[in-house]
Amino acid sequence: MQKDSMFTANDPFLTSLISQFALPGICQKAERFGRGLINDTYLCEFDDRGNARKYILQRVNASVFTRPDQVMENVAIVTGHIVKKLRAEGIADPSLVTPSLVPTKNSALYLCDDTGAYWRMFNFIESGTVFDTVVDVKHAYEIGCGLGRFQSLVSDLSSDLLHDTLPGFHLTPRYLKEFDDALKAGVQNRIAGTVAEQAFVERHRQLAPVLTDLIGSKKIPLRVVHNDPKVNNVMIHNGTHEALCMIDLDTVKPGIVHFDFGDCVRSAANPMGEDATDLDTVKIDLTLVEAIASGYLREAGAFLTRTETTALPLSVQVITFELGIRFLADYLKGDTYFRIDYPDHNLHRARVQFKLLESIEASQERLASLVAQCAHPL
């Protein structure tokens, strides 16, 4: 892999890759794009008989996704399904409003370079922008709409068609067991110094199986879910400022809607963020929760079962607890998973999530009322 941040059209490495995709015109340049930490991403600019066209070239990170081929099959199934649904709604060119794969000249979904790395090409959606944090209440509403719209579009797509590319992801009891294992075999001085955090986990242990028990009892269905519904994965239209689509689809796989809703609210309705410096400022913003839930249920309410809707508020607690114990377990094990910026970073992250969970618990009755009101507006 070359290290330069920008390549000319004559660069042999990218020229070879790009030339294998079925694209019109001539590539003028390709430069690194975005701030993503997972995949190498390049914006490719083409001249098609005087018309400028843009595409996104990405290398799939095989160290994160051990089966890139399965990731690509999932992405192809989901994007293909969404494109068909949008065309049925009368949208002539869905590539303008949703991610879609550009095939290779051999009609493949991706190609492999000489090192075995997987590469794929997407359309570039010029009419949309993403934001790293929630701008205002209207933006929070559109985040909810974007997530609900995505889930609605794939609600009739069988999750059996998708690979489980991240086994065990969002299965909270698994993360609780990893925490328990870390208490037995972790860094001793870190174990000794986190008595208060360990006690917090013990007091909330009953949260771990809440969602998995619903899955096991088949009270809620497995569906196609996004699994990474953070703020900057909901693209906003530049003109209308409405949700356009969800991007970054590598994590799509079978799951339950609560994984997405709970994580979306946890991340978007915490204005101080995961690295808040002052724990006393960490709290759930119920105004943002109401906006997210209102937008989400406007789009998703029609296909959700009553049991699914009823369980939405508690999912925010479960997912927040889950992330907190993941941070704490990683700290106890010596920071082997999450990237850190300073020695106690993961411990601080865990404390932020636990503080947020306390706020969610204190607001649970109101949160449940907000979801109920959004699900059944007057």
Where are these regions (language model features)?
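Juxta-kinase regulatory segment immediately upstream of eukaryotic protein kinase catalytic domains
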Residues: 1-31
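ATP-dependent phospho-/nucleotidyl transfer catalytic cores
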Residues: 5, 31-35, 56-59, 65-69, ...
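Conserved ATP-binding subdomain of kinase catalytic cores across diverse folds
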Residues: 29-33, 37-47, 51-184, 257, ...
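A short, acidic/glycine-rich surface segment
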Residues: 106-112, 210-212, 328
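Catalytic activation segment of kinase domains across protein kinase-like and atypical kinase folds
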Residues: 218, 232-273
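Active-site activation/catalytic loop segments of kinase-like enzymes and analogous catalytic loops
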Residues: 258-302, 318-337
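Small/polar glycine-rich anion-binding or flexible loop at a beta-alpha turn
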Residues: 309-319
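Long, compositionally biased intrinsically disordered regions
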Residues: 360-363
